[in-house]
C-alpha cells in the first residue's frame, strides 16, 4: 500500500506546473467548531465552502525504486463537474530552511473516462477514499478542514466509513516557482491558528 493520502485539497480549477507551499495538522472532532469559528474571523469567506470528493490513487511501477503516483478525483456534490488528475512531486531538496513543504503540483481537469484511461496506460489503483469537509480562502491561501472516509466497496463512495475521530487540516498556496515569500505568508497565517491546531511541514516519506 502506498502512504495514506497526503493533501486532499478539494477539486477546483487547477493550474499546470506550479509549486505548492503546504503545512498540515489535525484536530479531534470536538475541536472542529472552535477552529471553524476562528477561520471565519480570519478568512475572506465568512462561511466556508463545503466539499465531498472521491479520490483514487493510482500507481505505475517501473524500473525505478518508487512507483509513479497519480491521483484521480471527482466531486460527489456537483454532478457533471469534471474529474481532476493530480500529480504531486517530491519535496524540493534543500528546503529545510523554508517554513513550508514545497513541491511541484500539476492539476488538470479531465473527462469521466479518466479511470479507464489510467488503467489502459498501465496504472493500477492502490487505494481510494472520500474526503468531506470545509474550505476557506485567504488571498492566495486555502485552508481545508476535512475528514477522510474509508471506501468499503471498490468504486462505491456511498456508505464510506470515517477513518478516524479527527479532521485533517491543510493550509496551502499554489504559485509559480521562485516565489518563496509565499512560504512566509503561509507560516504567518498558521501561527494565527495556534493553539487550536499545530500546522507543520510533514514529509510524505515519513508516512511510508
Swiss-Prot record:
Ordered alphabetically, the record's keywords are:
Activator, Nucleus, Transcription, Transcription regulation
| A cellular component annotation (GO) from this entry | mediator complex
Where's it found, cell-wise?
A: Nucleus
Disulfide cross-links = none
User: Mind telling me which Pfam families this protein's record contains?
Assistant: Med18
> Mainly resides where?
nucleus
Report the domain of life of the source organism.
Eukaryota
Q: Which molecular-function annotations from GO does this UniProt entry contain? A: transcription coregulator activity
Keyword Transcription part of the UniProt annotation: yes
Q: How the protein assembles, per its UniProt entry?
A: Component of the Mediator complex.
Per its UniProt record, what PANTHER family does this chain match?
MEDIATOR OF RNA POLYMERASE II TRANSCRIPTION SUBUNIT 18, MEDIATOR OF RNA POLYMERASE II TRANSCRIPTION, SUBUNIT 18
- Family named by the database record: Belongs to the Mediator complex subunit 18 family.
What function does the entry list? Component of the Mediator complex, a coactivator involved in the regulated transcription of nearly all RNA polymerase II-dependent genes. Mediator functions as a bridge to convey information from gene-specific regulatory proteins to the basal RNA polymerase II transcription machinery. Mediator is recruited to promoters by direct interactions with regulatory proteins and serves as a scaffold for the assembly of a functional preinitiation complex with RNA polymerase II and the general transcription factors.
Q: What is this protein called?
A: Mediator of RNA polymerase II transcription subunit 18
Q: Specify the taxonomic lineage.
A: Eukaryota, Metazoa, Chordata, Craniata, Vertebrata
Amino acid at each position: 500500500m502506498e502512504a495514506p493520502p497526503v493533501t486532499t485539497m478539494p477539486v477546483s480549477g487547477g493550474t499546470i506546473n506550479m509549486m505548492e507551499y503546504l503545512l498540515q495538522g489535525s484536530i479531534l472532532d470536538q475541536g472542529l467548531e472552535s477552529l471553524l469559528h476562528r477561520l471565519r474571523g480570519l478568512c475572506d469567506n465568512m462561511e466556508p465552502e463545503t466539499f465531498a470528493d472521491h479520490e483514487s490513487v493510482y500507481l505505475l511501477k517501473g524500473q525505478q525504486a518508487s512507483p509513479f503516483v497519480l491521483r484521480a478525483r471527482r466531486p460527489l456534490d456537483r454532478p457533471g463537474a469534471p474529474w481532476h488528475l493530480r500529480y504531486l512531486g517530491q519535496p524540493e531538496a534543500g528546503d529545510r530552511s523554508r517554513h513550508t513543504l514545497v513541491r511541484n503540483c500539476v492539476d488538470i481537469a479531465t473527462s469521466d473516462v479518466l479511470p479507464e484511461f489510467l488503467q489502459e496506460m498501465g496504472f493500477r489503483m492502490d487505494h481510494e477514499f472520500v474526503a468531506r469537509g470545509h474550505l476557506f480562502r485567504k488571498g492566495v491561501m486555502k485552508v481545508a478542514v476535512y475528514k477522510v472516509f474509508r471506501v468499503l466497496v471498490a468504486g462505491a463512495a456511498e456508505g464510506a466509513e470515517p477513518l478516524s475521530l479527527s479532521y485533517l487540516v491543510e493550509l496551502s498556496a499554489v504559485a509559480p516557482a521562485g516565489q518563496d515569500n509565499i512560504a512566509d505568508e503561509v507560516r504567518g497565517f498558521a501561527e494565527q491558528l495556534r493553539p487550536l491546531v499545530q500546522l507543520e511541514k510533514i514529509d510524505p516519506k515519513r508516512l511510508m
